[in-house]
A protein has these predicted regions:
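Conserved beta-strand positions in repeat-built beta-propeller and related beta-rich domains
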Residues: 19-24, 66-69, 109-113, 158-161, ...
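Structural signal for beta-propeller blades
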Residues: 25-28, 72-74, 115-117, 164-166, ...
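Blade-level signature of beta-propeller repeat domains, shared across WD40, Kelch, NHL, RCC1
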Residues: 203-209, 219-234
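A short beta-strand motif characteristic of beta-propeller blades
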Residues: 1, 33-35, 39-46, 82-88, ...
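A generic, well-ordered mixed alpha/beta core segment in the N-terminal half of proteins
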Residues: 1-36
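Beta-rich, blade/repeat-based domains predominating
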Residues: 3-17, 41-60, 89-104, 135-153, ...
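Short loop/turn segments immediately following beta-strands, especially the blade-tip
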Residues: 32-34, 79-80, 120-127, 169-175, ...
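Loop-centered beta-sheet repeat module
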Residues: 61-115
Length: 234
């Protein structure tokens, strides 16, 4: 058991296994080391308490990172989930998931509540915030929630639930340039990339859609899957 409510993300680091519990604002190092966050953010509906959403190791394996959507923070912890230091996104943004650059020098955080990406520079012992970039087109005025974030071949991809798209950014160290949008099915909660193919989980229309990176991001197949939430590869 994860010793919390609504477990939503899991990771391994060597032989250690970690998970986070969204509704109880906690992280666990299995089997029984629990870290419970305290506090709240400025959004009364979504940040009334801590909401841990992602756990993952930095590429150098020095820290276990835990994002807290309710506190607008990223916690950098030791292997026993003791907090070493934190990094913050702007208030009310809602830090959701992280992606790490191939060289390990940059961390990219998708902010669920404002549909943006905040870039941090990481030197192995601290992080510095750089810039925040919108993942939506300027003309979009509807409701949207940022969701998944991935890096593949010097591009960064972020899914939008509402605009129903995957935003494509070109990466230049700590700079991002929004270059394209892939239009998806309804509510693309998660996606992943392998062999130049994007596999996108469209939760509300029961499909997984496949796109070819080498063929101008063209839709090449649609698979029926009931309420898909996550896609991963062995």
């Amino acid at each position: 058991p994860t010793k919390g409510k609504v477990a939503c993300h899991i990771c391994t680091c060597d032989d250690d296994v970690y998970a986070v519990n969204y509704s109880s604002g906690s992280a666990i190092h299995f089997p029984d080391t629990l870290a419970v966050h305290e506090g709240k953010g400025i959004n009364p509906k979504r940040q009334e308490m801590p909401h841990t959403h992602f756990v993952g190791a930095t590429p150098d394996k020095k820290y276990i990172c835990v994002t807290d959507l309710g506190l607008d923070k990223i916690f950098f912890c030791d292997r026993n989930l003791n907090t070493c230091f934190t990094a913050a996104v702007p208030q009310g943004y809602g830090a959701r998931h992280l992606a790490f650059s191939d060289d390990g020098q940059y961390i990219y955080c998708v902010n669920e509540l404002v549909s943006s990406v905040t870039v941090f520079e990481y030197d192995g012992k601290s992080v510095k915030p750089r810039e925040t970039y919108s993942a939506l087109p300027n003309e979009f005025c509807g409701t949207n929630l940022g969701a998944a974030i991935r890096i593949y071949k010097n591009r960064l991809y972020v899914s939008n639930r509402g605009h129903n798209s995957i935003a494509v950014f070109d990466i230049n160290d700590d700079k991002l340039e929004l270059s394209d949008f892939i239009m998806t099915g309804d509510h693309p909660r998660d996606f992943n990339i392998a062999d130049d193919m994007i596999f996108c989980c469209n939760m509300n229309d029961d499909t997984v859609t496949l796109y070819s990176i080498n063929d101008s991001l063209r839709l090449i197949d649609t698979i029926s899957v009931k309420a898909p939430l996550c896609v991963n590869f062995e």
